[in-house]
């Protein structure tokens, strides 16, 4: 199988180490992975802001670039969910059949559900608290949404439990939003910051050293709170742990 690696623009610009770790992780698991150098934004910021024409152009470019791969994998539940749930409708208005939406996966979802490894050759001797992003929980179902009252599961935890030396915790109010929400963080700054502060405190109450998640946008928001208030905790993307050898 041939896998196309999709790296969202904010990871490319702000957390390039997450993109590098994603590539290395997939290679270490025996995946034939390719990174298209001319990829661009998936169009989510434009669509969320109401710029339909701009988001359509980017959705069309994305589909043309990735549609020939067997799988498309990205380290962002938010952007992956946007492609999966919104690109078909956006492109339908142009008479274009979206071929990429049915084969795109968040990287953790892909490893857990498609590759199904029995072990991951990683070591991370630290305490971590899992952050479930809204898109990951409610659109990709990477973990069980608490409001559905269904049996517990968490694919992030399943993968982290394979890492040597790690201690994994989960905060109270595990499905509660961190307050980022894209444009929400700009338009409702005070509320967004308050939500972020509450979320970080929930994670800190577990006694962890790191907040770990699958969405760098959420982690970026909480990192802002942590830096502003000089809190003794760090953020880390899950792929950085799964690809870790130290």
Where are the regions that the model predicts?
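Iron-sulfur cluster-binding electron-transfer modules in prokaryotic oxidoreductases
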Residues: 1-246
């Amino acid at each position: 199988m041939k896998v196309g690696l999709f790296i969202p623009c904010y990871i490319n610009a702000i957390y390039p180490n997450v993109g590098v770790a994603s590539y290395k992780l997939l290679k270490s698991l025996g995946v034939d992975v390719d990174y298209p150098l001319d990829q661009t934004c998936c169009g989510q910021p434009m669509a969320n802001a109401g710029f339909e024409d701009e988001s359509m152009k980017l959705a069309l470019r994305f589909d043309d670039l990735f549609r020939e791969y067997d799988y498309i994998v990205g380290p962002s539940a938010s952007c992956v969910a946007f492609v999966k749930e919104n690109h078909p409708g956006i492109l339908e208005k142009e008479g274009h059949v979206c071929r990429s939406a049915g084969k795109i996966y968040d990287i953790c979802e892909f490893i857990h559900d498609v590759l199904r490894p029995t072990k991951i050759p990683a070591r991370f001797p630290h305490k971590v608290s899992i952050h479930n992003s809204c898109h990951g929980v409610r659109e990709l179902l990477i973990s069980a949404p608490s409001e559905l009252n269904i049996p517990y599961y968490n694919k992030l935890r399943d993968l982290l439990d394979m890492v040597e030396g790690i201690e994994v915790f989960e905060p109270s109010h595990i499905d509660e939003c961190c307050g980022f929400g894209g444009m929400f963080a700009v338009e409702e700054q005070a509320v967004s910051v308050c939500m972020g502060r509450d979320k970080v405190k929930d994670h800190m109450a577990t006694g962890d050293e790191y907040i770990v998640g699958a969405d760098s946008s959420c982690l970026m928001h909480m990192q802002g709170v942590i830096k502003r208030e000089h809190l003794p905790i760090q953020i880390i993307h899950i792929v950085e742990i799964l690809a870790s050898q130290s």
